[in-house]
C-alpha cells in the first residue's frame, strides 16, 4: 500500500526576528512555498500576535502548511503535509531558507499507513 501522505515537521532556529514577526512576509512565503511544490491553494489564514509572533495556515487541496513563530527566540515550528505525489520537502526547504534558519531539525512521517514510523531525521 502506498502512503496517503507525507508530513514534514521542522524546528527552525536562528531565524531572522523581523521576518518571524512580519505577517505579510510569512503569508507570502507560505503561499509561494505551496505553489512551488505544485499545490492547489484553497484557503489562507494568518494571525499576528502582540507583542510579537505569527501563526498561520495555508490549506491546500493536498492538505496544509502551518507555522507558529516565536521571534523573541528566533524560532518557528512549521508543518508541511501533502497527500498524493507532491513532495513536502520542496515547500519546507523554501520556508526554512526564506526565514533565514541557521539550524533546522526535521522529521518526515508517512501518513495513512498505520503505526507511525519516522522515515528520516536531519539537521542543518
UniProtKB/Swiss-Prot annotation:
Protein name stated in the entry: S-adenosylmethionine decarboxylase proenzyme
Cofactor requirement: pyruvate
GO molecular function: adenosylmethionine decarboxylase activity
EC number from the UniProt entry: 4.1.1.50
InterPro entries given in the database record: AdoMetDC_C, AdoMetDC_fam_prok, AdoMetDC_N, S-AdoMet_deCO2ase_core, S-AdoMet_deCOase_pro-enz
SUPFAM superfamilies per the UniProt record, alphabetical: S-adenosylmethionine decarboxylase (SSF56276)
Domain of life: Bacteria
Protein purpose: Catalyzes the decarboxylation of S-adenosylmethionine to S-adenosylmethioninamine (dcAdoMet), the propylamine donor required for the synthesis of the polyamines spermine and spermidine from the diamine putrescine.
Modified residues (Pyruvic acid (Ser)): 63
Residues flagged as site, Cleavage (non-hydrolytic): 62-63
Natural source organism: Anoxybacillus flavithermus (strain DSM 21510 / WK1)
Amino acid at each position: 500500500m502506498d502512503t496517503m501522505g507525507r508530513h514534514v515537521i521542522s524546528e527552525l532556529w536562528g531565524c531572522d526576528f523581523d521576518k518571524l514577526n512580519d505577517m505579510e512576509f510569512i503569508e507570502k512565503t507560505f503561499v509561494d512555498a505551496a505553489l512551488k511544490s505544485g499545490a492547489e491553494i484553497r484557503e489562507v489564514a494568518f494571525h499576528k500576535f502582540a507583542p510579537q509572533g505569527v501563526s498561520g495556515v495555508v490549506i491546500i487541496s493536498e492538505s496544509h502548511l502551518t507555522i507558529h513563530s516565536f521571534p523573541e527566540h528566533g524560532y518557528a515550528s512549521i508543518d508541511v503535509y501533502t497527500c498524493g505525489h507532491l513532495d513536502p520537502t520542496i515547500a519546507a526547504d523554501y520556508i526554512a531558507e526564506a526565514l533565514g534558519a541557521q539550524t533546522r531539525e526535521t522529521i518526515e512521517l508517512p501518513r495513512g499507513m498505520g503505526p507511525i514510523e519516522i522515515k528520516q531525521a536531519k539537521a542543518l
